């Protein structure tokens, strides 16, 4: 996840100062997996790209999300993903799980909105 700082700086520059949250981080990760598959396919032919995606196996060291990697099962789902939970704390998104990557301590129960 070493690239996340660089990606966040670029995102912040083009998003009005907002930090990267889960949706754009997952979109970036999916786009990078697709780019890798296109390179592996050596073609823009959809069937070649599909085959490359079926065989893709990306390790966690090149991702900006805390997945264990990217590898698609027979159902087309990533078998190496895991949940990432965020809370809004002090007006900003903050990762609270997985605990080993948490940027903020989980607040539970969440305080009432005033």
What is each PLM-predicted segment?
Residues 1-114:
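Extracytosolic ligand-binding ectodomains
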């Amino acid at each position: 996840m070493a690239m996340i700082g660089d990606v966040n700086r670029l995102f912040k520059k083009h998003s009005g100062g907002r930090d990267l949250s889960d949706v754009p981080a997952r979109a970036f990760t999916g786009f990078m997996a697709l780019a890798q598959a296109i390179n592996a396919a050596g073609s823009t032919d959809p069937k070649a790209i599909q085959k490359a995606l079926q065989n893709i196996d990306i390790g966690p060291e090149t991702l900006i999300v805390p997945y264990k990697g990217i590898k698609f099962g027979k159902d087309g789902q990533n078998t190496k993903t895991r949940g990432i939970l965020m809370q809004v704390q002090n007006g900003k998104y903050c990762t609270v799980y997985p605990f080993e990557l948490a940027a903020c301590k989980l607040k539970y129960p969440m305080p009432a909105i005033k």
